[in-house]
Amino acid sequence: DTHRSLALLSRARTIMKTCVAQIDVLETMTPLQFASFRARLSSASGFQSAQFRELEAVLGRRDHAGAGAKEGSGMKMAEHLVPGSPARLRVEAAMGRASVWHSALRYCHKRGHPMPQEALEYDVSLPWEAREDVQEVLIALHRNDPESSMVCEALVDFDEGLGEWRYRHVKMVERTLGKKIGSGGSSGVGYLAATLFNPVFPDLWEMRSKL
């Protein structure tokens, strides 16, 4: 349903904008103020956020967005969660279901824009890699189907919002921690910066250079 999809994606984008705006509040904290209670966090880290991993899995990501993500074979986003825990089971279940991206491909296909059969039948538990044949279909869609194009652009809007969140997160951590190791043991700013240019819907970005 085109109109329902647009309404839901618009709401999701607005929620993402609200999340990004919260960083303004966190940035009122000075490095010394954060350091005064950082030890109490122990190894707690946003890296451990099952909800964020579940969000990424629902969208279509199957590996961490950071450096080396493309080297994996999928199903790795839940490895840091306690085996058998409700949080891990939720993330693993999301990674085993058709994602928003998979649903978008089927939506376009049903709208009369035939997607490659391999793209429609790919193993949803594995990471998606951008495909030129899919991008060719998306290019034709943008030129000939304004309504479907609006849905695709709404997906780009949300993906861009996720990128804004990542960027603001990186800069907040950099101004608060500098180059220190992250609370959860990651490389800190280095790890976060590596997540910046890994969109969830790569085909919708790559096709633009071919229009």
Walk through the language-model features, giving the residues of each.
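Surface-exposed peri-terminal alpha-helical interaction modules
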Residues: 1-211
